[in-house]
């Protein structure tokens, strides 16, 4: 079994006990899936769903003109092929995008004046270019202007209805005031709120509030726009009250005698106002002033009582539920919502009306809030209500009934203006238990009525009604790339729609074609702006593969339509119980964004509505099945969920009598038969970065957060090493990140070199088919990443090896053997050493630097642009004025540095000269110019030089020239090289297809008898009739004649068919490569005014140095404080010096014990490797090796992973065993999954296998004496982080100054100075260093006059220093004067004279800025 010692596959001993049920979904699927759904590029136009781009077009089109005599309709769209591929876009600084073409139809109508009927006069259909749309690369990124960017998914509040209260903060009484808000996806918000008097108000779009009943009445006046509306509602007071209150019928039995119908539901909780007796037995069922209990109500029903007596005082406070009208006169005796009084009842009795309906309001469970609101409301008809709403929304506009109704209908019932989205509709249906179709995304009357009902129920304290938790993941949803872009596209199309409407009405529509109407500029501008400057379109973090993956899986609550850092409180940032398995509780930034930026958990995915789902295993009758289903936070609510590590036997039954479970965010202890679901895996709780931390369960959460964040900052090293102690997820991250090369099809490796791999794929084909069975993988060599780290791929397969689809065949940056490798395994000791590891400092061995263990390569890109200026063209050349030959030694004749040159700060990379402005010449100069020609004087050197702090090797140069500009020698050379590379690929591809085709013909011909003589072009015989073909004979015939060999049967026809197929494939390949070469040869698209652009790439080797930041995976970070020679470091008994000495005090208070466990397990794993190495050296037999390997890899306990490994080792052939053991010489790799890791007894067993100890005796390297106590020594995986001292060190001599204050700029990028702040001034004062202080505050900062004097003094050799006035003092005076305070500076005559003299020398006024000053805020190159 060859797989064990293949180079692209590593076996790890896995300590996990839990069998893997579900595979981790592709880590960047969220990006790809969302964008594919948006574009629907591979779906035929007629089959596309109305989502994404198709949905936007469908919602904005048709566009009609103002008179509705013509309309522009959308038919379909399609994407064309992108102009450049991904690599070309990278190199040329282009955007990777595809042109989009839209088919539109312009329909012109004729309108019949009398009947108003419309008939079609004219239809024109046309395909219109609609701008470009960026495409996503297969790694889930976008290339915008040559840089890779990621669009981060946004976590925002889901549309729907939300209920809340003010927590008693609004009113002094501390009363809870409830409110409700209907949030659409786009459109106006509706807010309902109670005030402290229990009156219900409504606000539309946060305007002034109205009584809520105004809105309810207005619903009655909406014309039948919502025909589908399920509720008949006309907005009368009676309807409103009956919708929200139950009614009781009161009958008048005589003066002061009343009774009411017995309604069991309304009696519960009421008090009896007198003894209630059974009519037959006269037994008292409910005593006076006692509550009606459930049993009492049952007795009343059993006694068949139809009505109950009512006391008069109870009746006299009731509220009438409807108008009571005298039918004879038509007079209203008792109005709806009027209080029933004794006088009113008497009036009714007189008129013989003995029955009326009242509202059931008991002031306990049912409060009169809505009735009180109606009383407050002065409006009586729906029409008035609509006018009132219009006045609120458009103050100062005189309303007419028509405009008012239009406005109201457009606000909530018009799909163009209001959109709940499917999600909003889903949420409303779920909340109120209604079954409105999801396609109806506008509000209905019922929605608004139900929101008010729910709010009133909340106020009344009805059971099972509760306020919403807005941090619940059922109320927050994810907007991924596709949806964000869809919204942008809609904005662009709406802008375009206005322009189209205007054009349709302005011009003669009959003569126009669709393309005359459409200008796609607004759409492309919006898209460009979104990708270029939106808060959610971010520069990809490309430090290492993990940072790429994490960036694509990030969820941000910030951005347009989201929160802002300042407004976000603690609740939003906090971990919520619904985050379990959906959002990682650990990985989030420290600082102001904590909790607002999160990461998706490992197994999480986003469903079609944008809610985050996590997988669970079904549990049936206490038995766990292997059926896996995804649940969103809302769907999971009612389930009881067991943990992934709950003990289960082989058949899936829980082994314990009770199981710890989660339900609705609480932790409960239940019987196995009550459990519904079970977690899929222990690491489904955390994100990718957190699940790469071994022994995460033993680390404090704060440190785990730092650990997972710092792994993203690890720099890819020159020599990669996968961790000895991993978690088993490393290979998945490396595969999904896209930095490795993955085989596309099964096949056999044909050839391998450093820059490409050729694989002959297994293509099942028919006898005559010649399919393209070649996969050529061109590897990325020394490319610069966004963070200036180096992207380089190296093959890990050999020719002749079989590869499977999905296998890693080439390692990328920070990967080794297809596994993520962010750092190095080093031997660490926990002990203090001479104070050099005080406060988290790190002491290093010189070996790490000598052997380049932590060396990384960084690539800087420098760009030089030759422009066409007003004074003439700039030129890139070797001929530079006033520069010695020494400085030009590495430039070629085109003025560009040669590849391989070593450069240091100040060296010329690209020679460039710029024309100078003409100056007034003296007569002598004119004469000299006339005699010697005038070349040298009129140009200045503006070459690109290496900036300070950069020294390295030039690894690449690229030249881009404008179309029509003659290419220089260097550009031609680069072009030829690229062309040769492409031709090589083409020829290889053709060669492999040819071999395969003639192999097929050979198989057909072998053993056949020739039926006719075969001659070549010259008439010489190649085969004679009757020859029997074998390999040797066939090889004598040139391949081009094989199709002409005559044999019996249809073999010759088949052979000819194969040759024809081969020729066809060959032409296809040539065409493909021809296109690429054509693109290479044509000129480049450069920005306006640019003639030529040169990019030079310099590779810098950064060794580990004092001041570099290093970290482990457990949040244990530190700075290198000293590099010690190997001989001075503490060493072990066998003489091995340790590599790193860490401070033991970094562990207890930080509570990240995981690092100690990792150290022990790493030590055990390393020692197992050493023991195997000894066994090979002592030539042990294969069976002993096998036994040792089995013990190390499979352990004694077994488990699904160990059993597989044991079987694997048993299958290894004897002669390959030493080879396998040899691969483990640096240590055996183990995996300890998060929350399911190695136990203490397993670690001890492995220690014994490698005869390692938990603590070792260490000897002092300087004296040879053993240290007093045993020391914890082991192997830890250490990372070098991106905070490198070489990139931070900076010094300034003379540089740019700020324009106003004349003080030096700040920061390395501006070549700025060091700030001397208030406290530093105090320190200097405390020392009494007056002259130094004066110098700091004047000439070294902003004393313009003093700076000049200082220069003069130095030139003249004088040692006196006279400081003048700091410029910022003048600024202060001017600012005071601007406040109308007349501040004047009084000068002594000497000072005045000195100042004037200096100003004369400077040639400026008091604010005359010297050369080199720049406006602050502008970046200036030093």
UniProtKB/Swiss-Prot annotation:
Record's catalysed reaction(s): RNA(n) + a ribonucleoside 5'-triphosphate = RNA(n+1) + diphosphate
Catalytic activity, EC: 2.7.7.6
GO CC annotation terms, alphabetical: DNA-directed RNA polymerase complex
UniProt keywords, alphabetically: DNA-directed RNA polymerase, Nucleotidyltransferase, Transcription, Transferase
A Pfam family reported for this protein in Swiss-Prot or TrEMBL: RNA_pol_Rpb2_7
One of the record's GO molecular function terms: ribonucleoside binding
PROSITE patterns from the UniProt entry: RNA_POL_BETA (PS01166)
UniProt enzyme class: transferase
GO terms (BP aspect): DNA-templated transcription
Superkingdom of this protein's organism: Bacteria
Coiled coil: none
Disordered: annotated span: 1392-1422
Function text: DNA-dependent RNA polymerase catalyzes the transcription of DNA into RNA using the four ribonucleoside triphosphates as substrates.
PANTHER family reported for this sequence: DNA-DIRECTED RNA POLYMERASE I SUBUNIT 2
Entry's family note: Belongs to the RNA polymerase beta chain family.
Subunit-level organization: The RNAP catalytic core consists of 2 alpha, 1 beta, 1 beta' and 1 omega subunit. When a sigma factor is associated with the core the holoenzyme is formed, which can initiate transcription.
Protein name: DNA-directed RNA polymerase subunit beta
Organism expressing this protein natively: Anaeromyxobacter dehalogenans (strain 2CP-C)
Gene: rpoB
